[in-house]
């Protein structure tokens, strides 16, 4: 799971 600032990798 790679959640940065947006909602990628959810």
Curated annotation (Swiss-Prot):
Provide one Gene Ontology cellular component: extracellular region
Tell me which UniProt keywords the record has, alphabetically. Answer: Amidation, Hormone, Neuropeptide, Pyrrolidone carboxylic acid, Secreted
**Cellular localization per UniProt:** Secreted
Q: Which domain of life is it from?
A: Eukaryota
**Residues carrying Threonine amide:** 10
Keyword Secreted carried by entry: yes
What's any GO biological process attached to this entry?
A: neuropeptide signaling pathway
Pyrrolidone carboxylic acid modification, residue list:
1
Q: What does this protein do?
A: Hypertrehalosaemic factors are neuropeptides that elevate the level of trehalose in the hemolymph (trehalose is the major carbohydrate in the hemolymph of insects).
InterPro entries per the UniProt record, alphabetical: Adipokinetic_hormone_CS
Q: Provide the GO MF annotations for this entry.
A: hormone activity
Q: Which family does it belong to?
A: Belongs to the AKH/HRTH/RPCH family.
Q: Write down what this protein is called.
A: Hypertrehalosaemic hormone
Where mainly found? secreted
Q: Which residues cross the membrane?
A: none
- What is the organism field in this record? Nauphoeta cinerea
